Amino acid sequence: QLDFRLEGCNTLEERAQKMANILNLNINMFLTPEQIREKIDLRNEGNHFLRVVERDNGQKSILRLFNDNEKHPSETEISTALKRFVVQSPKVAFLTGHEMRDIYKTGDRDYNQFAENQYFRYSLGNQGFDVVTLSLEDQEVPEDIDIVVIADMKTPFDEIENDRLNKYIARGGNLFILGDARRQEIMNPITEQIGVTFMPGTLIEMKEND
């Protein structure tokens, strides 16, 4: 019976050597984390398995495995990866502050799953978008931003933030605005500038068995 207990192994190297001995493997078959990073640094990918598509000019695109039943990239994700070689990816900026929904948090009210999660097939990054966050308190909307997302803000913008947003709108920038119920007073000063108003109430779709 094999003993997989690692008592007395205090370092990663000691644990690796003991596991190799248990399984009768040559430890030299394996690369250390440092040696792997000399070839490719996967720390931003959680050290997960992935495929790298590379052109002759050195341009690279990534194909990931996903946390779903299909696992492998479909034609859609493969086409998206190849498209990055020839088309500039649209860049989406999620505004921060004012208690807006957060793309880095995984709670029910936040947007990590579809905005930032690398292993969710339908996240924006895996569907051909580049995603960043942006604070209007700190800076203007950069010229390379294609879409600005205002996600359910709970406190109003100040004068500087409003001015920076208005400049973006004036140059024809795209906006995606989301507001929860009972946020009219906060959201309407923004949307009314483009002829849209959040109305009181909740829209309900009734079904036959309800």
Task: Please tell me what each predicted stretch does.
Residues Q1-D210:
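Short, surface-exposed patches at the edges or C-terminal ends of soluble domains, predominantly
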